[in-house]
Swiss-Prot record:
Keywords: Endosome, Membrane. The PH domain specifically binds phosphatidylserine, which is enriched in recycling endosome membranes, it doesn't recognize PIPs. Residues 2-109 form the PH domain. InterPro entries: PH-like_dom_sf, PH_domain, PLEKHB1/2. It comes from Mus musculus. It is found in: Recycling endosome membrane. This is Pleckstrin homology domain-containing family B member 2. GO terms for molecular function: phosphatidylinositol-3,4,5-trisphosphate binding.
Length: 221
């Protein structure tokens, strides 16, 4: 923020109607501040021109005021405020009075600073994202397959009996985990039962027959 115009002006007091010299600063944001002197240590008053000022009078337009001794009426300047207060001023010269008039008038009617401040605030509100709590984070869905609840058909096995006849009977499988193991068909062949005593008798009989045959052969020779 910078100064738009600064300088000395005579200001008439509100009660005693005396003229007093003050230092005036007009800032770029539209604030007109006047001090006791140029050091700016003691502020007399301030006026926000875009908000407080409703009219600016110069020269013969000024009311209820007489210029200080030695000053023409064209050096007079009045700032009419919204609250009914009127600040009566007198410039060093007519040209200085016109320069102050035009500068103050531009500051009063120029709402670029106020408008930009309001616009930036609205833009910031519009551009700001909503609270994160407004949008809940979606819960991720997990898809899986449960264990197989069905049962595989029972396998079969073929069993041959001693007489050579085949039989198909279901085969029972042990537990094979969650998914189980597919059954398979198996063939089991059982050899026919042989009697050990019968085999021994047949062997002895065969041996005796062989011995008799050999004995007869030797007897002939």
């Amino acid at each position: 923020m910078a100064f738009v115009k600064s300088g000395w002006l005579l200001r008439q007091s509100t009660i005693l109607k005396r003229w007093k010299k003050n230092w005036f600063d007009l800032w770029s944001d539209g604030h007109l501040i006047y001090y006791d002197d140029q050091t700016r240590q003691s502020i007399e008053d301030k006026v926000h021109m875009p908000v407080d000022c409703i009219n600016i009078r110069t020269g013969h337009e000024c009311r209820d005021i007489q210029p200080p001794d030695g000053k023409p009426r064209d050096c007079l300047l009045q700032i009419v405020c919204r609250d009914g207060k009127t600040i009566s001023l007198c410039a060093e010269s007519t040209d200085d009075c016109l320069a102050w008039k035009f500068t103050l008038q531009d500051s009063r009617t120029n709402t670029a600073y106020v408008g930009s401040a309001i616009l930036s605030e609205e833009t910031a509100v519009a551009a700001s994202p909503p609270p994160y709590a407004a949008y809940a984070t979606p819960t991720p869905e997990v898809y899986g397959y449960g264990p197989y609840s069905g049962a595989y058909p029972a396998g079969t096995q073929v069993v041959y009996a001693a007489n050579g006849q085949a039989y198909a009977v279901p085969y029972q499988y042990p537990y094979a985990g969650v998914y189980g193991q597919q059954p398979a068909n198996q063939v089991i062949i059982r050899e026919r039962y042989r009697d050990n005593d019968s085999d021994l008798a047949l062997g002895m009989l065969a041996g005796a027959a062989t011995g008799m045959a050999l004995g007869s052969l030797f007897w002939v020779f």
